[in-house]
Amino acid sequence: MSIIKNSVWNLFGYAIPTLIAIPSLGFLARGLGPEGFGVYTIAIALVGYAGIFDVGLTRSVIREIAIHRDNHHERTKVISTSTSFLVLFSCFGAFLLLIFSDGIVNYLKISGVEHSDIQLAFKLLAICIPLFILNQLWSAILEGDEKFGIVNIQKSISSSCIAGIPAIFVFYSATLSAAVAGLIFARVISILVSAYYVRNDIKISGVHFCYKTFKRLFFFGGWMTVSNIISPVMVYFDRFIVSNIMGADKVAFYSAPAEVILKLGIIPAAIGRAVFPRLSNIKDFKEFKRNVNKSLLLMFLICLPVIIIGLLYSGLVLKIWFGENYQINSFNILNVLLIGFFFNALAMIPFSAIQALGKSKITALIHCAELVPYLALLYFMVEKYGLLGAAISWSIRVILDALLLQWLYTRMCSVYEN
C-alpha cells in the first residue's frame, strides 16, 4: 500500500471518534465546569505522559516488525519479549501514580472542585496506565505489518469509546471521578478490541523473554524513551504550569483550544503513522528520499487549508463547541496554537525519516536540548502574559523544532548520498 492510501485509512480511523469527541468534550466542559474540565484534561495528559513506561518499545516494535515481516522466528521473539516486559513495567508505573497522586493534586492548586473527588479520580487513573501501554504495543504490531485497515477499525472503536463513554458517566454523575471511571471502562473495551485483532500473534508468541531481543529493542527504544520522557513534558506541562501559577480554574481556557489542536492533530498523525513503517522497510536510499519528499508535500497541501480555515473561524468553533466563555477567553490562544500546529505537522516527516534510518538518538538529543530553554520560556511567558504566553511559548518551540529537524535531515541526506 502507498503512503497516501495508508494515510487515508488512518484518517478514516479517526473520523468517527472525532465526530463523537466534538459533542462529548463540549458536554464535559459544561457538565464539569471550567475548573473540573481543566483538571480532567490534565488527567488525560497524565495518561499520555504514562507513555514513558513503554521505554520506547512500541516505536521499536513497529520498526522491528516492519524489518522482520517475513521472519517468523524473529517476529515471535519481538512480540513475546516486548509484551512480557511491558506488562510488568506498566504496572510499576501505575503503582507510582497511585503513590504520588495526592502530591500531584496539591501541585495543581485546585479551589472550586471537591478535593476528595479529585484525589479519588487520580487514584483511579492509575488503572489506565497498563491498559494504555498494552493497547499501544498491540496496535504497534499491526502498524509494523502496515495493516492499516485493521488498525483503524480497532482505533475507531477504541477512540470512540474513549471520547464518548466519560461523557455518559458524567451525565449520570457530574464528578471528575465519574469521568475517570468512564475513561477506565473505555480503556478496558479498547484493550479487548486490540487483543482480539492480535490474538493469533499473542497465542503463537507466548510469554517468553529474550534478553538479546530486548537489548536490540531497547537500544533503539532507549533513545525513544528519552524522547518519550521529554516530549510529553513539552506537550502537556504547559497545563500544569498554568494551573500552578494561575490556578486550576484558568486551565480550561487554555486546555479547550489545546484540545482543538489535539483533534486537528489526527491529520498529521494519520500521515506520520503511515510514513514511519513504510520508510523503515525501504532499502534503497533514493526511493527513501522520494517517499520523504512526497510525504512532506502531502502534509503541506493537506494542513495549509485547515490552518487558514481555522484562523478565520476560531472564535465560532470555540463558541459552538465549548460555549461563549471560551470564545471570549480562548480565541487568541487558538490562533497562536494553530500557527505552531502547522510547523509541528510538517516536522513529523523529517522526524519519522530520521528515526526510520535508526537515528533515534538524534531526535532524543534534540528534545534534550530543547527542554530547559522551553520550560524557562514557558514559565516566564505564563508569569508575564498568562494563557497567551503559554500558547506563544509552545508555538515558538515547535517552529524551531521543525526547522532544526528539517536541517538535520537534509544534512543526513548529503552524508548518505555521498
Curated annotation (Swiss-Prot):
The chain crosses the membrane at residues 8-28, 37-57, 85-105, 124-144, 165-185, 217-237, 251-271, 297-317, 334-354, 362-382, 385-405. This is Putative O-antigen transporter. Could be an O-antigen transporter. It comes from Shigella flexneri. Pathway: Bacterial outer membrane biogenesis; lipopolysaccharide biosynthesis. CDD domains: MATE_Wzx_like (cd13128). Belongs to the polysaccharide synthase family. One of its GO terms (cellular component) is plasma membrane. Keywords: Cell inner membrane, Cell membrane, Lipopolysaccharide biosynthesis, Membrane, Transmembrane, Transmembrane helix. Pfam families: Polysacc_synt. It is found in: Cell inner membrane. It is a multi-pass membrane protein. One of its GO terms (biological process) is lipopolysaccharide biosynthetic process.
